[in-house]
Regions:
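Extracytoplasmic gate region of multi-pass secondary transporters
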Residues: 31-32, 209-253, 257
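Central cavity-lining transmembrane alpha-helices of secondary-active solute carriers
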Residues: 54-67, 250-262
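Conserved MFS/SLC helix-loop-helix module at the cytosolic interface between two early adjacent transmembrane helices
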Residues: 62-97
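Helix-to-loop junctions at the C-terminal end of transmembrane segments
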Residues: 63-75, 260-271, 354-355
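Cytoplasmic helix-loop-helix junction between adjacent transmembrane helices
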Residues: 105-143
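Helix-loop-helix hairpin linking two adjacent transmembrane segments in secondary transporters
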Residues: 139-186
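C-terminal transmembrane helical hairpin of 12-TM major facilitator-type secondary transporters
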Residues: 273-316
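A late C-terminal transmembrane helix in Major Facilitator Superfamily
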Residues: 326-356
Length: 403
């Protein structure tokens, strides 16, 4: 693990991509802290306020396969521009006076996030050594998780001091990091040749294996998004203040960061399928403990949920990239995009359930979802199968991945 982290620190491009991932995902972490302010300002229900996450996450999700295709064809030199766009559009959210306009800005901001994620993941895959790709991708993904974790704390500080207009300050990190990322990645390769594109498009894809990977990713994203989105609102309903639910939301996400790195290391040793199944099984009691026993004990159970629920996303991302090695940009867009859209759609769905039966019971339903997902995950491809598919396509890897 130390050797792989050292590789990130020595490689300026990897380090800059980590910084960009941290920054773009910090905006995701701010959204749940905005919920209480938006509910009061626009007189929204829980289901309606969840549309903000749907607008942001849905646009990011739907657009990712398209941006992945563009990355396979034209390269990834403009990754920093996507980050800057996200920063500018998100920073204006606190200054609009109508909910439809706010949703429009959330859509625009999500478009920038949708561009950044497949481009960044494709860059990182090409820069990492093959022998520790699971851990390396996990470290990169962890940077985004740390950004999500920092988001609630940043939001609490800014909104506590400036109200909803505090979003204006959020333009600064995105513009600075986006500009630096553009400069660092200026030497990346451009468009691929027509012959390579044609070879990649005609290579057969293991559809069933890819569908299973995407299905597990979608389920995990739903659970992660819902718990991160509604923890602040649930605890406000229970009578707790921002000083309690802000750190609790951050604990939930930081635990995800630790779990991501830990599971990446374990996957390199024991295999990704084994690690994914183990985390799914352990997630069921973790969800029940978190929802049945709210209060100060939630900091301990939040660590369990965070560690288990979000930790396997980079493993599934790498699986998809290897299953579609000659179209890794599209693979990144598909697995992350469909995962994003499920998480985004899941927030208003659970919000509607919460309006009917309460937030606590709404969150508890995810124990059932995880049990169903265990059955799906049983059909995940084994390491030798993934490597075989990857080897068949590795010679057709596109030039955007070359350094």
């Amino acid at each position: 693990m130390i050797n792989v982290m050292g590789e990130f620190l020595r490689n300026g491009k990897l380090l800059t991509l980590m910084l960009g991932h941290l920054t773009v995902d910090s905006y995701v972490g701010v959204i749940p802290v905005l919920y209480p302010l938006l509910i009061g300002r626009f007189h929204l229900s829980l289901a309606t306020v969840g549309l903000v996450s749907l607008a942001y996450g849905g646009t990011a999700a739907i657009s990712q396969p398209l941006f992945g295709l563009l990355a396979d064809r034209f390269g990834t030199r403009l990754t920093g521009l996507a980050l800057a766009w996200t920063a500018v559009t998100f920073s204006v959210v606190g200054f609009v006076d109508s909910f439809p306009l706010l949703l429009t800005l959330a859509l625009a901001s999500g478009l920038g996030s949708g561009a950044f994620h497949p481009l960044g993941a494709l860059d990182v895959r090409g820069l990492l050594p093959t022998w520790r790709r699971s851990l390396g991708m996990s470290i990169y993904v962890t940077a985004g998780t740390v950004g999500v974790a920092a988001g609630p704390l940043i939001g609490i500080l800014l909104f506590g001091a400036y109200g909803v207009h505090g979003t204006g300050f959020l333009v600064l990190p995105g513009l600075v990091t986006g500009g630096y990322l553009l400069w660092r990645m200026r030497g990346r390769a451009g468009a691929v040749t027509a012959a390579v594109r044609h070879a990649g498009m005609t290579t057969p894809v293991p559809v069933f294996a890819l569908a299973v990977v995407i299905g597990v990713m979608m389920s995990r994203s739903w659970t992660v998004n819902v718990f991160q989105a509604f923890t602040p609102t649930w605890y406000e309903q229970l009578g707790y203040g921002p000083a309690f639910y802000g750190p609790l939301a951050t604990t939930l996400v930081l635990a995800s960061a630790v779990g991501t790195v830990g599971c990446g290391s374990l996957a390199d040793r024991y295999g990704r399928r084994t690690v994914i199944l183990a985390t799914l099984v352990l997630s069921v009691p973790a969800i029940l403990l978190y929802t049945v026993f709210p209060g100060p004990w939630a900091f301990a159970t939040a660590i369990l949920i965070g560690f288990l629920a979000a930790s396997t996303a980079p493993l599934m991302l790498l699986m998809a990239q290897q299953l579609m090695a000659s179209r890794a940009g599209l693979a990144s867009g598909l697995v992350m995009g469909l995962g994003f859209v499920t998480g985004a759609v899941g927030v208003p769905i659970n919000g509607a359930i919460a309006d009917a039966i309460g937030l606590q019971k709404s969150l508890m339903t995810h124990a059932v979802l995880v049990i169903i997902t265990i059955g799906i995950a049983w059909f995940l491809p084994r390491e030798d199968e993934v490597e075989r598919y990857s080897a068949q396509q590795e010679a057709l890897r596109t030039s955007p991945e070359q350094v």
